[in-house]
Amino acid sequence: MNEKNKNDESKHQEDKLQDQKMWNRINKFFSRSIGQSAKRAPKPKAISKSQSFRILNRFNAMERNSIHMIVILSIISLLLILLLSPLMRFQKVEITGNHDLTKAEVLAASGINKKIPAWQLLSEQHYFIQRAEKNSQIKKVKISYLNMQVAQIKIEENSKVGLVTKKDKNYYILADGKFIPAQSVGEKPQRLPNYEKFPNDKTIKRVAMQFNGISKALQNSVSEVIWSPDHEDDEKVILIMDDGNKVLIKASDIKNKLKYYPGMVAQIDKNGTFNFQVGTYFQQY
């Protein structure tokens, strides 16, 4: 009988010791989590094994959740570091399709530079395109990616087709008839025809849009575009050519007829006037 009592008492002491260890573990966890001293934890009371098991399972679940949270935060931190890393920035931005505009002017218009992270250019592409197209000289923009290190900006320009003087100030005439100030600081002079004697901006726009329909080489061979209507043709235009010739042509026919000029000049070795108004003929000076 005494031996049985001793065994029961020993088992009871072991259970109490296990409970004490469990409470010590819980107190230690809470003291780390909220700064509460383990000494201030409530004095443990005797609990059953099933209660101990439930508490231990709950505690283990809390530990697992804490570990999961730490892993998630670590992954997010790693992603942020990668996104902001120099490795995630384009090392080169190529510009194509520009003739009048320089590479620096295209980049400035779009707001794109090497400091912009690759993810930002990818996610906000529409914004950069809209910003670039606000420039009067940029008609269309396309952004593509050759690889994760090289981006390409392809533009279609609203080309300069001439020069005009308005109120003692010089302006470039763009292909759509808009005007922009000429000769900005540091800008190289361009070889463009001067538009003379035009009565209004609307008439200039009509001729400019026609002029944009011919080749760049042919555009560059014209030094002056003179509005010169008469009783026979109310939209007659005189073109003074760099080669010493003169061309008479209807404004609305510039795109369709002036393209034949180079072939005609090649067959004539003297200077004179080429008339494209009614039919086509040459009159020597």
UniProtKB/Swiss-Prot annotation:
Transmembrane region(s): 67-87
Compartment(s) where it occurs, according to its Swiss-Prot or TrEMBL record: Cell membrane
InterPro entries listed in its UniProt record: DivIB, FtsQ_DivIB, POTRA, POTRA_FtsQ_type
Domain of life: Bacteria
Topological domain ranges for the Extracellular compartment: 88-285
GO biological process, one term: FtsZ-dependent cytokinesis
Domain POTRA: from-to ranges: 88-158
Record keyword Cell cycle present: yes
Cytoplasmic face residues: 1-66
Family, as annotated: Belongs to the FtsQ/DivIB family. DivIB subfamily.
Main function: Cell division protein that may be involved in stabilizing or promoting the assembly of the division complex.
HAMAP family documented for this protein: DivIB
Protein name: Cell division protein DivIB
Organism in which the protein naturally occurs: Weissella koreensis (strain KACC 15510)
